Protein backbone atom coordinates (compact mmCIF):
# COMPACT_ATOMS: atom_id res chain seq x y z
CA UNK A 1 0.00 0.00 0.00
CA UNK A 2 1.30 3.41 -1.02
CA UNK A 3 0.18 6.31 1.17
CA UNK A 4 0.07 9.77 -0.42
CA UNK A 5 -0.19 12.62 2.09
CA UNK A 6 -0.28 16.20 0.85
CA UNK A 7 -1.07 19.83 1.65
CA UNK A 8 -2.14 22.20 -1.10
CA UNK A 9 -2.82 25.91 -0.90
CA UNK A 10 -3.70 26.72 -4.51
CA UNK A 11 -4.57 23.28 -5.88
CA UNK A 12 -1.29 22.68 -7.73
CA UNK A 13 0.14 20.19 -5.22
CA UNK A 14 -3.26 18.48 -5.00
CA UNK A 15 -3.20 18.11 -8.79
CA UNK A 16 0.26 16.56 -8.47
CA UNK A 17 -1.07 14.13 -5.83
CA UNK A 18 -3.87 13.13 -8.22
CA UNK A 19 -1.42 12.53 -11.08
CA UNK A 20 0.88 10.51 -8.82
CA UNK A 21 -2.05 8.47 -7.51
CA UNK A 22 -3.13 7.66 -11.08
CA UNK A 23 0.41 6.53 -11.93
CA UNK A 24 0.58 4.27 -8.85
CA UNK A 25 -2.75 2.67 -9.81
CA UNK A 26 -1.69 2.29 -13.45
CA UNK A 27 1.45 0.50 -12.25
CA UNK A 28 -0.73 -1.99 -10.36
CA UNK A 29 -0.27 -0.97 -6.72
CA UNK A 30 -2.84 -0.11 -4.06
CA UNK A 31 -2.80 3.54 -3.08
CA UNK A 32 -4.53 5.85 -0.62
CA UNK A 33 -4.43 9.63 -0.87
CA UNK A 34 -5.20 11.94 2.05
CA UNK A 35 -4.53 15.50 3.17
CA UNK A 36 -2.19 16.09 6.11
CA UNK A 37 -5.15 17.62 7.96
CA UNK A 38 -7.20 14.42 7.60
CA UNK A 39 -4.75 11.84 8.94
CA UNK A 40 -2.37 11.31 11.84
CA UNK A 41 1.31 10.53 12.27
CA UNK A 42 0.79 6.97 13.54
CA UNK A 43 -1.41 6.00 10.59
CA UNK A 44 1.07 7.41 8.07
CA UNK A 45 4.02 5.80 9.88
CA UNK A 46 2.34 2.39 9.64
CA UNK A 47 2.77 2.39 5.84
CA UNK A 48 5.87 1.03 4.11
CA UNK A 49 5.82 3.45 1.16
CA UNK A 50 4.93 7.07 1.92
CA UNK A 51 4.70 9.97 -0.52
CA UNK A 52 4.60 13.42 1.08
CA UNK A 53 3.56 16.52 -0.83
CA UNK A 54 3.94 20.19 0.06
CA UNK A 55 4.46 23.29 -2.07
CA UNK A 56 7.26 25.75 -1.46
CA UNK A 57 6.08 28.41 0.95
CA UNK A 58 7.59 31.70 2.09
CA UNK A 59 11.28 31.71 1.39
CA UNK A 60 11.54 28.13 0.10
CA UNK A 61 10.27 26.26 3.14
CA UNK A 62 7.55 23.77 4.10
CA UNK A 63 4.10 25.07 5.02
CA UNK A 64 4.56 25.91 8.70
CA UNK A 65 1.18 25.48 10.41
CA UNK A 66 0.32 21.92 9.27
CA UNK A 67 3.12 20.25 7.30
CA UNK A 68 6.19 21.29 9.31
CA UNK A 69 4.79 20.15 12.68
CA UNK A 70 3.45 16.92 11.12
CA UNK A 71 6.80 16.14 9.50
CA UNK A 72 8.66 16.94 12.73
CA UNK A 73 6.48 14.40 14.57
CA UNK A 74 6.72 11.84 11.74
CA UNK A 75 10.50 12.07 11.25
CA UNK A 76 11.51 9.78 14.16
CA UNK A 77 9.22 7.07 12.73
CA UNK A 78 10.59 7.12 9.15
CA UNK A 79 13.68 4.96 9.68
CA UNK A 80 13.61 2.09 7.19
CA UNK A 81 10.63 3.50 5.27
CA UNK A 82 10.57 4.25 1.56
CA UNK A 83 9.60 7.90 1.12
CA UNK A 84 8.95 10.06 -1.92
CA UNK A 85 8.56 13.84 -1.83
CA UNK A 86 6.70 16.17 -4.17
CA UNK A 87 5.48 19.72 -4.44
CA UNK A 88 4.89 22.73 -6.62
CA UNK A 89 6.48 26.15 -6.54
CA UNK A 90 5.90 29.53 -8.11
CA UNK A 91 9.27 31.16 -7.54
CA UNK A 92 12.77 30.22 -6.50
CA UNK A 93 14.73 27.19 -7.59
CA UNK A 94 13.40 24.30 -5.54
CA UNK A 95 15.72 24.69 -2.56
CA UNK A 96 12.92 23.65 -0.19
CA UNK A 97 12.82 20.23 -1.85
CA UNK A 98 16.59 19.74 -1.53
CA UNK A 99 16.38 20.61 2.18
CA UNK A 100 13.32 18.36 2.71
CA UNK A 101 15.05 15.47 0.95
CA UNK A 102 18.12 15.87 3.17
CA UNK A 103 15.99 16.01 6.32
CA UNK A 104 14.17 12.86 5.21
CA UNK A 105 17.39 10.99 4.46
CA UNK A 106 18.72 12.06 7.87
CA UNK A 107 15.85 10.10 9.50
CA UNK A 108 17.15 6.83 8.07
CA UNK A 109 14.45 6.64 5.41
CA UNK A 110 15.23 5.80 1.80
CA UNK A 111 14.12 8.59 -0.54
CA UNK A 112 12.77 6.79 -3.62
CA UNK A 113 12.31 10.00 -5.61
CA UNK A 114 11.23 13.61 -5.70
CA UNK A 115 9.01 15.59 -8.04
CA UNK A 116 8.80 19.36 -8.30
CA UNK A 117 6.67 21.25 -10.79
CA UNK A 118 6.55 24.98 -11.46
CA UNK A 119 2.95 26.14 -10.99
CA UNK A 120 0.28 23.70 -12.30
CA UNK A 121 1.25 20.19 -13.36
CA UNK A 122 -0.21 19.07 -16.67
CA UNK A 123 0.58 15.40 -17.13
CA UNK A 124 3.97 16.15 -15.61
CA UNK A 125 6.42 13.32 -16.28
CA UNK A 126 7.89 13.89 -12.80
CA UNK A 127 4.56 12.85 -11.25
CA UNK A 128 4.29 9.72 -13.36
CA UNK A 129 7.87 8.73 -12.56
CA UNK A 130 7.36 9.19 -8.81
CA UNK A 131 4.13 7.18 -8.90
CA UNK A 132 5.80 4.36 -10.81
CA UNK A 133 8.76 4.35 -8.41
CA UNK A 134 6.39 4.14 -5.43
CA UNK A 135 4.47 1.25 -6.99
CA UNK A 136 7.71 -0.70 -7.46
CA UNK A 137 9.18 0.15 -4.03
Curated annotation (Swiss-Prot):
An example molecular function term from Gene Ontology annotations: electron transfer activity
Gene3D superfamilies, from UniProt?
3.40.50.360
UniProt entry keywords in alphabetical sequence: Electron transport, Flavoprotein, FMN, Transport
- Which co-factor is required? FMN
List the InterPro entries hit by this protein, alphabetically.
Flav_short (IPR010087), Flavodoxin/NO_synth (IPR008254), Flavodoxin_CS (IPR001226), Flavoprotein-like_sf (IPR029039), NADH_oxidoreductase_modular (IPR051285)
Q: Would the keyword Transport be found if you checked this record's keyword annotation?
A: yes
Q: Name one Pfam family in it.
A: Flavodoxin_1
Boundaries of every Flavodoxin-like domain copy:
2-137
Which PROSITE patterns did the record assign? FLAVODOXIN, FLAVODOXIN_LIKE
State if Electron transport is listed as a keyword.
yes
Highest rank taxon of the organism: Bacteria
Family (UniProt): Belongs to the flavodoxin family.
> What does the UniProt function comment say about this protein?
Low-potential electron donor to a number of redox enzymes.
Q: What is this protein called?
A: Flavodoxin
What organism, scientifically named, is this protein from? Megasphaera elsdenii
Amino acid sequence: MVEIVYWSGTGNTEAMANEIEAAVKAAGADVESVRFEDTNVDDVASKDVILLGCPAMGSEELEDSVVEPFFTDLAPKLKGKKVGLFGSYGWGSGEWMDAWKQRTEDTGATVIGTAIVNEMPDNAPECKELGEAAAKA
